[in-house]
């Protein structure tokens, strides 16, 4: 029997043998029946993960890794499959009726009289029926309508139904979410698709999502047609409207048809929508997010619910469609819709009551066989959202793609058809054309074009929607409960709640910092009289310096209600996944030239010393005063306000995932708040902190925002501004800031801010965008011509704080002058009148004026500025990316981020001394340097993806791969058979003494020819497969020594001695740390060969590398496909070109990268294994050397004379010099001389 179980798990379940062995020996499962009955249907999803995979190596090292997730998914599928086996028991949990409840059916209709749902069927599956809800309260379903009686305080309170108490009403809705979607056996599959949640379908969905995002054939001209919306007045007119009365017209007038909607008339021939469909993307997680957006759920509750429901499948969302030509009855989840089914006809309005108590009017049109296009009015908001559903066959399955557009943003959900039988019954057709069209035929669309329609209900003369009629009172009650669920109030500028761990900034948070430091909602700390560098006491606690106090204040108000930083949209903003994305985004940002103010090239205004002096002592609290320096000029290039965002994309809580405390400390040093010695001490004290603490809580309502931010910089926790209008901020430093935000489009805001004490203006752009499952906000700040980037991730759609009233400072900042000009003299449309006029004073500032002046004096005399060297900041001597601690012992051999060792004047074969240590030869020194920067943080080579790259398992794989590589004939450059270019002796001589640091010079030898057979660039990788840390598992030191002998750097006698000395070393030391973002990569590699530790390149563009030997290298990498890169490299001292191909691929649980290098017709292979998805190093800005290498010539030819499409212009033009090389030119020339005279080749 055990053998039968093993055979089933391995052959049918494709479960890993290690997991199977544990089940047989560890859990002592002896038969298929044992496996099938080991968990209940309620527990198996968690069970296979917690009881098996979490106990089996290597999966238990990180259950979030793809390999572990795959095994969990396969075991779940195997357990479900085992339920159908003859020897397996089926431990399904049937719902139990409440005592006294009876399920009765009407003989004629087949519907239950009490619930209005279908009678018959089983409790654990099938179409929604009376048996499935018999365990709930008697009145949870009546007349076919779902009307749960939630707690009067809202859905976040516990809810009891059928004797069972749910933690919240939302937990109840989650259970209701799946009602009616399962098959008769309690599963989701069916005859057309047995397992809709299999890994194969998950992979298919990922491919379909990528295809969908590139599709430009969506309805409404790819959703570019304008979408109608009701005015506030129209929404108000419909308040209290009786949607149950079919004889009434909408009081707001007819709803406009969306422009671009096709007309009905087509009648499908094959009924392709008919059947049962299960969601295979979206599901419960998406449902929770939507509920948060809709105000049904707050941040703390959603966080808890997400944790409770992690074990659930994606599914639960479903469609049961009875299609008969152009008429459909559709069953869908009762968690959102109040009733389980509705029947509609193509081109006619239908009505839906929502569980939230709201009202929806919508239309589906079937313009062709496999497509339906719809739009839906949410009458409480006046918004219209548009949808397209498209059915198609893929891999033997029928898929339906749903594209939903709300306010210009398109999202996709996919369904798979699991059965041609919807397993539910149709209900009679009714329509709401008369009401929705307000009795008017041929109502126009949103562009004024008449649309063929008749304002008469299809079920006329029926006068009332009886289902709604029976439940009107309950629906109104639900709407009230949902609307008031999470209301909070504001108290003297702080939120009124008593959670000391997290939430918006409140009195409970600041109590420990001393009430005297927070007054009237203003942060006014009492620093030491001598400045911030002196100790201070607050709330009975003594801080080493005022800055230590500010660091603690820095993250006040940014945490969630549990005291962490995450939220329902992003649980771990400091996890590897998000941090990896951020590193890629930083690389992309550094090459972006689309920033505001013409990429910040427009001149930035600045006040003169005289104007700054005029404003000294100005009373910024008095809103009736004009600035004595005259109106502040608008920065040239600022867009004008007027656009009103439709979707409020900034609304929510955002956490900084780059920058944070370390960046805050650096900024404090720059601004003179903190000196170097103090900074080192503080950084040491705060290393244990997360990056975060910096945060934004934004309440957005169109063009008006209330923003909560760190009180470490701003004296008050929140401010409200309107697009295009000045607001005022007192700073903790005692300074004064006047600024403006403009919202020129949906996902972007552009601002500028005047620091009135210095007269400086700094400009900012914030841009929101999705990346993977997350929403990021990129902040680009320009000060003095330098652009820096900070990234935020949205962790919750709930800001967790409340807005405060709007005020502005237009009169003061514009000195009473309308249409004040920008700094180029061009008038900017504006009115110099405060939005909150006739308010005369800023009361908050007025109350705290004395404290602010005192703070300004203390900050101004604190410290001076410092600057850092050119290696990554870090203090880990054992490992990590190359940092100052690694190279500290090598003294002046590392300067300005460059490796420039001082070898013996007679050559590398002679002894040398570095940092007090004597090396037998320069080459022994280089061998030690060879490993710098390649190790993990613990000083080893492994990582989470491969713990032991030099273990027997990986080495056996590598030996096999080396043998396979020798017989591979699919290498680049036509298997390296295409001729390889080479410079002539004359060309090499021309380049002697060339200044490679000058980016404005052309190579004197003419353009370097492209190697024949090189693919053209243009492909942009989607998954960044090269991103991470790679360790060499073949080649390494031994290969490095051999190459040194060949190149003349080392003779045979010395080589024999060195090989004997280094035999005890691992193969490794050679490594790659790659930060990949699409077709741009920053690569860290060994400083034993390359003089600098890292370089950034873009596919198809030349980059330059100075070599430790003193030579110069110009090369190109091209990324022609997802897992491959092809390159060539010119050694300018020899004139030789060597060609390389790197190819990444999975083998077993590992990802390998094979490097094929061709020099002089001979091919050699080196293999790397990826040990971590985190490169553990930072990217640097992109630069290129196209102009120099191509000698200023576009479309330079290959060595066979064929033009290659190129542009001879550097990507970082107009930058004129390579600064790193410039600082080290003299030393590089010296090294070249020493290396060249070492040995005979």
Swiss-Prot record:
A Pfam family recorded for this sequence: Luciferase_N
Location (main, coarse): cytoplasm
A GO term from the CC aspect: cytoplasmic vesicle
GO molecular function: luciferin monooxygenase activity; oxidoreductase activity, acting on single donors with incorporation of molecular oxygen, incorporation of one atom of oxygen (internal monooxygenases or internal mixed function oxidases)
Activity regulation summary: Regulated by pH: upon acidification, at a pH of 6.3, dinoflagellate luciferin is released from luciferin-binding protein LBP, allowing the interaction between Dinoflagellate luciferase and its substrate luciferin.
Biological processes per GO annotation: bioluminescence
Enzyme Commission identifier(s): 1.13.12.18
Superkingdom of origin organism: Eukaryota
Region annotation (Luciferase 2) ranges: 491-842
Keywords for the protein's UniProt record, in alphabetical order: Cytoplasmic vesicle, Luminescence, Oxidoreductase
Region (Luciferase 3): 868-1218
Compartment(s) of residence: Cytoplasmic vesicle
Reaction it catalyzes: dinoflagellate luciferin + O2 = oxidized dinoflagellate luciferin + hnu + H2O + H(+)
Family: Belongs to the calycin superfamily. Luciferase family.
Misc. remarks from the entry: Dinoflagellate luciferase mediates much of the bioluminescence in ocean surface waters.
Domain remarks in the Swiss-Prot or TrEMBL record: Composed of 3 homologous Luciferase domains: each of the individual domains are most active at pH 6.3, and there is very little activity at pH 8.0.
Protein name as it appears in the record: Dinoflagellate luciferase
Organism: Lingulodinium polyedra (Dinoflagellate)
């Amino acid at each position: 029997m055990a053998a039968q179980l093993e055979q089933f798990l391995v052959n049918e379940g494709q479960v890993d043998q290690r997991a199977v062995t544990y089940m047989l020996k560890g859990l002592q499962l002896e038969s298929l029946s044992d496996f099938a009955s080991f968990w209940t249907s309620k527990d198996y999803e968690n069970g296979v993960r917690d009881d098996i995979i979490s106990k089996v190596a290597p999966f238990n090292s990180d259950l979030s890794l793809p390999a572990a997730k795959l095994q969990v998914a396969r075991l779940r599928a195997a357990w479900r499959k085992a339920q159908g086996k003859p020897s397996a028991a089926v431990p399904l949990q049937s719902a139990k009726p409440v005592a006294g409840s009876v399920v009765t059916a009407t003989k004629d209709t087949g519907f239950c009289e009490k619930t209005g749902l279908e009678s018959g069927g089983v409790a654990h599956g099938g179409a929604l029926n009376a048996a499935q809800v018999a365990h709930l309260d008697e009145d949870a379903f009546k007349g076919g309508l779902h009307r749960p009686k939630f707690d009067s305080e809202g859905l976040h309170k516990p809810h009891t139904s059928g004797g069972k108490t749910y933690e919240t009403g939302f937990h109840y809705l989650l259970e209701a979410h799946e009602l009616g979607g399962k098959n008769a056996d309690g599963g989701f599959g069916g005859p057309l698709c047995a397992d809709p949640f299999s890994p194969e379908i998950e992979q298919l969905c990922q491919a379909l999502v990528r295809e969908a995002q590139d599709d430009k054939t969506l309805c409404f001209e790819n959703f570019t047609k304008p979408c109608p919306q009701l005015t506030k007045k129209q929404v108000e007119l419909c308040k209290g409207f009786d949607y149950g009365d079919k004889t009434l017209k909408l009081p707001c007038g007819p709803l406009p048809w969306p422009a671009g909607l096709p007309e009905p008339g087509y009648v499908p021939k094959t009924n392709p929508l008919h059947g049962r469909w299960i969601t295979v993307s979206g599901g419960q997680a998406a449902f929770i997010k939507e509920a948060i957006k809709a105000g049904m759920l707050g941040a703390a509750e959603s966080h808890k619910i997400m944790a409770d429901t992690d074990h659930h499948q994606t599914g639960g969302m479903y469609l049961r469609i009875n299609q008969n030509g152009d008429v459909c009855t559709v069953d869908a989840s009762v968690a959102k819709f109040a009733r389980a089914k509705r029947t509609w006809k193509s081109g006619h309005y239908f009505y839906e009551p929502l569980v939230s108590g709201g009202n929806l009017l919508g239309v589906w049109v079937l313009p062709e066989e496999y497509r339906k296009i719809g739009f839906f009015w949410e009458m409480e908001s006046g918004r219209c959202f548009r949808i397209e559903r498209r059915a198609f066959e893929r891999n033997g399955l029928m898929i339906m793609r749903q594209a939903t557009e709300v306010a210009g943003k398109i999202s996709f959900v996919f369904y798979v058809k699991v059965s041609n039988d919807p397993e539910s019954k149709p209900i009679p057709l009714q329509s709401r054309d008369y009401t929705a069209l307000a009795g008017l035929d041929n109502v126009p669309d949103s562009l004024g074009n008449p649309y063929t329609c008749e304002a008469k209900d299809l079920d006329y003369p029926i006068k009332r929607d009886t289902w709604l009629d029976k439940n009107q009172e309950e629906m109104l009650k639900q709407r009230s409960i949902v609307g008031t669920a999470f209301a909070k109030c504001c108290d003297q500028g702080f939120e009124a709640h008593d959670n000391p761990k997290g939430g918006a900034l409140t009195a409970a948070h600041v109590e420990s910092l001393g009430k005297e430091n927070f007054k009237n909602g203003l942060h006014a700390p009492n620093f030491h009289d001598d400045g911030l560098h002196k100790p201070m006491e607050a709330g009975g606690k003594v801080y080493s310096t005022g800055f230590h106090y500010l660091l603690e204040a820095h993250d006040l108000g940014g945490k969630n209600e549990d005291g962490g930083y995450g939220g329902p949209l992003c649980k771990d903003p400091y996890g590897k996944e998000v941090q990896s994305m951020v590193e890629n985004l930083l690389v992309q940002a550094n090459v972006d030239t689309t920033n505001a103010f013409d990429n910040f090239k427009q001149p930035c205004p600045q006040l003169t010393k005289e104007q700054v002096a005029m404003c000294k002592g100005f009373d910024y609290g008095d809103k009736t005063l004009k600035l004595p320096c005259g109106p502040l000029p608008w920065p040239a290039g600022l867009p004008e306000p007027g656009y009103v965002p439709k979707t409020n994309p900034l609304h929510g809580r955002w956490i900084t995932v780059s920058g944070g405390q370390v960046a805050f400390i650096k900024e404090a040093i720059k601004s003179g708040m903190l000196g170097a010695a103090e900074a080192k001490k503080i950084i040491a004290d705060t290393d244990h902190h997360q990056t975060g603490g910096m945060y934004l809580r934004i309440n957005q309502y169109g063009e008006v925002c209330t923003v909560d931010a760190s009180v470490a910089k701003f004296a008050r926790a929140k401010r409200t501004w309107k697009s295009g209008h000045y607001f005022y901020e007192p700073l903790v430093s005692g300074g004064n800031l006047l600024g403006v935000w403009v919202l020129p489009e949906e996902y972007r805001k552009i601002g500028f801010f005047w620091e009135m004490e210095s007269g400086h203006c700094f400009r900012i752009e914030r841009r929101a965008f999705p990346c993977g499952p997350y929403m990021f906000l990129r902040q680009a700040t320009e000060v003095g011509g330098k652009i820096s980037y900070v990234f935020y991730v949205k962790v919750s759609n709930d800001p967790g704080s409340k807005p405060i009233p709007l005020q502005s400072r237009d009169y003061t900042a514009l000195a009473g002058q309308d249409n004040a000009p920008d700094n180029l003299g061009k008038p900017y449309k504006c009115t110099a009148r405060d939005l909150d006029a006739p308010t005369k004073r800023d009361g908050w500032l007025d109350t705290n004026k004395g404290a602010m002046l005192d703070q300004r004096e203390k900050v101004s005399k604190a410290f001076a500025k410092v600057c850092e060297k050119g290696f990554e900041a870090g203090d880990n001597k054992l490992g990590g990316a190359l940092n100052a601690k690694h190279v500290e012992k090598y003294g002046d051999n590392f300067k300005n981020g460059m490796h420039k060792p001082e070898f013996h004047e007679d050559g590398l074969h002679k002894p040398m001394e570095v940092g007090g240590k004597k090396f037998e030869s320069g080459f022994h020194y280089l061998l030690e340097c060879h490993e710098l920067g390649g190790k993990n943080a613990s000083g080893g080579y492994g990582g989470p993806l491969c713990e032991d790259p030099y273990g027997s398992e990986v080495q056996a794989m590598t030996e096999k791969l080396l043998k396979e590589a020798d017989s591979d004939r699919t290498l680049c450059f036509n298997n390296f058979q295409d001729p390889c270019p080479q410079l002539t002796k004359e060309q090499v001589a021309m380049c002697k003494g060339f200044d490679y640091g000058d980016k404005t010079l052309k190579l004197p030898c003419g353009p370097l020819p492209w190697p024949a057979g090189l693919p053209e660039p243009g492909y942009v990788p989607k998954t960044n497969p090269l991103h991470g840390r790679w360790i060499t598992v073949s080649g390494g030191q031994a290969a490095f020594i051999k190459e040194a002998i060949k190149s003349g750097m080392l003779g045979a006698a010395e080589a024999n001695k060195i090989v004997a000395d280094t035999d005890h070393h691992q193969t490794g030391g050679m490594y790659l740390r790659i930060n990949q973002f699409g077709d741009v990569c920053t690569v860290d590699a060994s400083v034993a060969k390359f003089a600098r530790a890292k370089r950034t390149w873009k596919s198809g563009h030349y980059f330059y590398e100075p070599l430790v030997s003193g030579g110069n290298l110009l090369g190109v990498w091209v990324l022609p496909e997802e897992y491959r890169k092809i390159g060539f490299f010119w050694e300018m001292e020899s004139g030789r070109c060597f060609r390389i191909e790197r190819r990444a691929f999975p083998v077993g649980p590992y990802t390998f990268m094979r490097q094929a290098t061709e020099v002089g017709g001979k091919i050699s292979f080196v293999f790397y294994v990826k040990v971590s998805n985190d490169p553990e190093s930072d990217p640097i800005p992109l630069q290129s050397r196209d102009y120099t290498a191509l000698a200023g010539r576009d479309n330079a030819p290959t060595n066979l004379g064929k033009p290659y499409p190129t542009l001879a212009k550097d990507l970082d033009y107009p930058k004129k010099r390579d600064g790193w090389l410039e600082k080290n030119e003299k030393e590089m020339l010296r090294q070249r001389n020493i290396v060249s005279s070492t040995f005979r080749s």
